[in-house]
A protein has these predicted regions:
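Acidic/aromatic-lined carbohydrate-recognition and catalytic surfaces
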Residues: 8-190
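Short, aromatic- and glycine-rich surface loops/edge beta-strands on solvent-exposed regions
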Residues: 1
């Protein structure tokens, strides 16, 4: 049988998929051309919000900024950041429209330490590394330091309310522009 655990022989009903009675796919989604975007890997439109080498630790190692976009990701590539952001997606809206895209499906964009953002820490705010960093500063971690309490640059970037509010405001502007073009946005909110 197949459920949320994949193909299994020992069935636990907790993991069974369920249908929501009365749910209907919206008409706008039927037959729409959808384009899924892993924001960090799409396009770097604002270099001021890029994660920098050693900004913080994720899964016991420092994060790194990838400078060669043609480089193959490491096996633990969740710590490698290419710098893609929402400004980059906005910059490429003409290109996406020319492809015939009608719906942008964005991988998670909320505050999270990984590049894929599937381990969201705060669903109320867009991650400033994808949005806007207006208040910056602090220090990156020393080479032998793995303690995020010392990652003052990261803390300032993702905790400062001005950064969080500016990132949310930028996202609202982004969605307005997408809608102005007759397109839709779907957020992956795991």
């Amino acid at each position: 049988i197949c459920n949320r655990q994949g193909v299994v022989s020992d069935v636990n009903p907790y993991f069974n998929f369920c249908l929501i009675p009365g749910f209907h796919t919206p008409d706008w989604a039927k037959g729409a051309v959808m384009y899924q975007i892993f924001v960090d890997r799409f396009y770097n439109g604002d270099k001021t919000n890029d994660v920098v080498d050693g900004e913080y630790t994720y899964i016991d190692e420092h994060v790194t900024q990838v400078r060669d976009w043609n480089k193959m990701p490491a096996s633990m590539g969740v710590r490698e950041f290419y710098g893609g952001d929402l400004q980059g997606v906005m910059d490429k809206l003409d290109y996406l429209q020319d492809l015939g895209v009608e719906v942008l499906y964005l991988n998670p964009i909320f505050v999270s330490p990984s590049n894929h953002k599937y381990d969201t820490q705060d669903y109320d705010y867009i991650d400033p590394h994808y949005g806007v960093i207006v208040k910056d500063g602090g220090d990156v971690l020393a080479a032998d330091d793995r303690e995020n309490a010392h990652a003052t640059k990261y803390i300032k970037r993702v905790v400062n309310m001005k950064n969080l509010e500016a990132s949310n405001a930028f996202f609202a502007k982004f969605v307005e522009e997408v809608h102005r073009r007759g397109m839709k946005v779907i957020l992956d909110g795991v």
